[in-house]
Amino acid sequence: MKNKIKYVYSDLDGTIVSWNPKNQFTHQGKTYKNLHEVSHATVTAFKQLQAQGIKIGIVTGRDYCRVRWLEKYLNTDLPTITLDGAIIYFRDEIIRQEVLDKEFIHGINQIVKRYPTAAFKLNMGWGNYYTCNPSLIFEGDHAYREHFNADSKFYRKEIDNTVDWDINNMKVNQVYFDTFTCPEPMIQELDNLVEKSDVTAKSYRHSLYIIKKGVSKASALQNLQRDFLVEMKPANTIVFGDGDNDIEMMQWADHSVSLTGSDPECYKLAKYHTDSVDDDGIAKWINKNLLC
């Protein structure tokens, strides 16, 4: 296997970035977890892979404003896959994006008009449109955007959820709700809309996000292989991941690594296994199997 691998795509959170980082950063007087923290062991392992000619890329569910600094810190070689495959960036340009249907966005618009206190955002390429409603999740977005990306194209706008939107001039890649702010009847309406629409929704403890149906980390890798990285194949690519949104790419690649503490199905599907992110699992696996 060692001599077969030419490409590495790694998830971030729970894979090479701990949910419990040692460091914090301060923005406008408030302190936030530094979810850009990658261990020295992992950074060193990636650099050693690159020195051997193996290319490194990031594949994540994060918004690019929470990835761009890390992409540059790790000096990645490959396009960066964000929003679980909905947008792919390379050298500060969008090279591919998947857009939600206008009919679906119209449906979202009609629902949020009935619940004016709900906090949500519309991800649209370099721009994110937020309600003015308080949200700890989106407060973190603003901190990462402004603290780490002062030199970028990112912009933030406010969207009024009490009026009809100009949907014809909107290209929305992802809709993201802070479900702490959404009443139960609203969640039910969103579930009903999702069920009859061409979309995929994922719900976690504090959030609900929606992207176009059929879009995943695996579909993004397949599109890159077809249109941009023709030499990248399942046989010469290894993926690292821990979550349920990593399952499809585990099935796509011939080589895959999951960590202790991962989503059970993801862990089961992975070809190889390693210690947890807090125990430098990925760095240990690379050193033992690719740098030996």
Curated annotation (Swiss-Prot):
Cofactor section: Mg(2+)
Pfam families: Hydrolase_3
Keywords: Hydrolase, Magnesium, Metal-binding
Signal peptide (UniProt feature, chain positions): none
Active site: 11 (nucleophile)
PROSITE patterns: COF_1, COF_2
EC number in record: 3.1.3.-
GO molecular function: magnesium ion binding; phosphatase activity
Binding, Mg(2+): 11, 13, 242
Top-level lineage group: Bacteria
Record's GO cellular component terms: cytosol
Binding residue positions for phosphate: 12, 60-61, 217, 245
PANTHER family in UniProt: HAD SUPERFAMILY HYDROLASE-LIKE, TYPE 3 (PTHR10000:SF8), PHOSPHOSERINE PHOSPHATASE (PTHR10000)
Family: Belongs to the HAD-like hydrolase superfamily. Cof family.
NCBIfam families the record matches: Cof-subfamily, HAD-SF-IIB
Protein name as catalogued: Putative phosphatase MPN_381
Organism: Mycoplasma pneumoniae (strain ATCC 29342 / M129 / Subtype 1) (Mycoplasmoides pneumoniae)
Lineage: Bacteria, Bacillati, Mycoplasmatota, Mycoplasmoidales, Mycoplasmoidaceae
